[in-house]
């Protein structure tokens, strides 16, 4: 199994800069970086008064996963923090990282009032992160994308029949989780989402609003 290198990801582009009126962290001066037990928040997160702001503006990676985990641990110990606002602009990236980040954010929804703001593009694994909160917003010109999960064994790598079967089973499990969460928050069926994923479907913020993926476009 050591020779098996799995890459569950899509090609990504560098996201463009974006801004949410009255909500973007760029609209507020960074005034507070709070140390806890010798640690400080990463460059993704800062705190002002009772609100933590987290900006995920890139492809999702294990580094992002680690930073977000550590930041959430820190702000969870800040008794003044009641709200978490996540600003998301990502073409996706590692599927494992996307699922892990989604799990970490979901874990704190009982602790904080979590809101997620989509802008630019939210695609592939980043959609899983977007679905975490019930408070989901998007800019008017934001686009979303869903596609089939795939794997790449790596250049020059070979796979046995049993390894291929194992990977197919894994892809089916990951796809089932992805689709289950899409069905949970939208008015589209499992079959409809599966068909959309086969074709790599891009859709607008207005479509996302009509389907229930987004609570408001602003």
Language-model regions, residue ranges each:
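N-terminal organellar transit peptides
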Residues: 2-4, 10-218
């Amino acid at each position: 199994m050591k020779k098996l290198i799995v890459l569950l990801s899509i090609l990504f582009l560098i996201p463009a800069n974006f801004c949410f009126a009255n909500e973007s962290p760029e609209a507020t001066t960074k005034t507070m970086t709070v140390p806890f037990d010798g640690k400080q928040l990463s460059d993704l997160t800062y705190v002002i008064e009772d609100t933590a702001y987290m900006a995920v503006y890139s492809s999702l990676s294990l580094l992002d996963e680690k930073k977000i985990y550590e930041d959430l641990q820190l702000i969870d110990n800040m008794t003044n923090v009641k709200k978490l606002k996540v600003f998301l602009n990502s073409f996706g990236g590692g599927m494992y990282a996307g699922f892990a980040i989604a799990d970490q954010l979901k874990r704190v929804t009982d602790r904080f009032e979590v809101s997620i703001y989509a802008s630019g593009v939210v695609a592939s694994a980043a959609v899983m992160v977007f679905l975490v909160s019930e408070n989901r917003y998007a800019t008017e010109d934001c686009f979303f994308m869903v596609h089939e999960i795939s794997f790449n064994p790596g250049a020059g790598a070979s796979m046995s029949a049993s390894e291929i079967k194992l990977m197919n089973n894994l892809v089916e499990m990951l796809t089932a989780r992805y689709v289950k969460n899409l069905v949970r928050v939208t008015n589209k069926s499992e079959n409809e989402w599966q068909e959309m994923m086969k074709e790599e479907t891009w859709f607008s913020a207005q479509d996302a609003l009509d389907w229930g993926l987004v609570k408001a476009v602003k």
